[in-house]
């Protein structure tokens, strides 16, 4: 979602890529990586929609996922969070690719690859991942030459993330504020990290002295726990008799989600409402798939209107709920799951 600001060749000011050029660009990338001893299909692979579009369509960039530990090994990088990315950028520069951008927040190095001459640049993204199989799954794209979908892979991914978000969330600290309103102070939820796997995470909204609730959340990385980093692990978590084909496109995932194979049918409404709100909040907003029933679109838009009105009211009356003093904190130390629902102890 957030990497939209740098898609389409924007990171290195590259031009659009013709589908007929994709294989040539991948071959050039292979020359760079094979010289380091990295093997296609084992250490790296192309992901995304490039090469899977109709002949007259273009791509903004070429996405290539590479095992981070292998890149670190072949470059002799240190253990610092940015070391391998900076080393990769320096290595590309030594090969003459001097137009590059290190984007550690997106786990990638984007660089300009000359095609016909030095000024004819296209963008290639080397994305460093923990697990290649997982990343090929999460960043796969339908084959548009075979009309496998009407939608981008991103539309499928947002649904996948919303399913996980609303099926696996619990409040670990509930806060009563000084006006007796009740809000979440700390939550635990599962999140999909496209380059890493499915994780259990925590975040809170407590201020520095834990006497107030603030607007921005704080991630509690000490609670990060890997749940699975295999496609089948995620599939089995969500579906009975699920297969990787269920995740091929938005349409196939939506069909599986609406079927009796989905393990959490009681969460369908809040997933679909949250899904619409997620697409609406994208910049720019993404068109809602026509498969989504209008009732959920209406409920999402009503929630959006209410949130906007509340924000305007609090601003006009100088009320900052996320900065209000805490009256009482209720902590849930443990929980069990019964019939696919959480019960607090």
Language-model features: locations:
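Active-site nucleotide-donor binding segment shared across nucleotidyl transfer reactions
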Residues: 29-77
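Acidic-residue sensor for enzyme active/binding pockets
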Residues: 2, 7, 21, 309, ...
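Structural alpha-beta junctions
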Residues: 38-40, 93-100, 165-174
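Helical scaffold of the NTase/Pol beta-like nucleotidyltransferase catalytic core
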Residues: 1-47
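Catalytic cores of NTP-dependent nucleotidyl/adenyl transfer enzymes across multiple folds
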Residues: 105-311
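Metal-dependent nucleotidyltransferase catalytic core
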Residues: 12-32, 66-120
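Short acidic, low-complexity intrinsically disordered linear motifs used
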Residues: 319-343
């Amino acid at each position: 979602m957030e990497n939209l600001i740098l898609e389409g060749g924007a990171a290195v000011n590259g031009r659009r890529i013709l589908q007929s050029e994709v294989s040539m660009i991948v071959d050039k990338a292979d020359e760079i990586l094979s010289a380091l001893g990295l093997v296609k299909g084992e250490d790296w692979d192309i992901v995304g929609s490039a090469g899977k579009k109709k002949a007259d369509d273009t791509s903004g960039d070429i996405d290539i996922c590479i095992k981070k530990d292998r890149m670190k090994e072949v470059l002799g990088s240190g253990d610092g969070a940015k070391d391998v990315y900076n080393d990769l950028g320096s290595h590309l520069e030594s090969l003459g690719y001097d137009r590059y951008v290190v984007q550690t927040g997106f786990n990638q190095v984007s660089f300009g690859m000359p095609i016909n001459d030095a000024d004819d640049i296209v963008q290639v993204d080397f994305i460093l991942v923990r697990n290649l199989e997982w990343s090929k799954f999460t960043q796969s794209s339908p084959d548009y030459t075979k009309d496998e979908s009407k939608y981008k892979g991103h539309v499928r991914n947002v649904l996948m993330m919303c399913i996980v978000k609303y099926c696996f969330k619990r409040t670990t600290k509930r806060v009563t504020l000084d006006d007796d309103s009740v809000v979440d102070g700390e939550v635990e939820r599962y999140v999909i990290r496209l380059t890493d796997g499915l994780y259990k995470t925590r975040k809170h909204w407590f201020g520095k002295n834990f006497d107030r609730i603030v607007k921005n959340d704080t991630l509690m990385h000490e609670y990060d726990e890997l749940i699975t980093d295999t496609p089948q692990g995620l599939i089995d978590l969500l579906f009975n008799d699920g297969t990787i084909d269920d995740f091929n496109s938005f349409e196939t995932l939506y069909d599986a989600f609406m079927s009796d194979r989905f393990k959490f049918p009681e969460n369908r409404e809040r997933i679909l409402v949250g899904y619409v709100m997620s697409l609406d909040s994208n910049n720019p907003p993404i068109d809602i798939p026509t498969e989504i029933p209008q009732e959920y679109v209406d409920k999402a838009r009503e929630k959006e209107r209410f949130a906007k009105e509340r924000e305007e009211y609090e601003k006009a009356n100088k009320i900052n709920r996320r900065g209000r003093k805490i009256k009482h904190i209720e902590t849930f130390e443990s929980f069990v799951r019964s019939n696919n629902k959480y019960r607090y102890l």
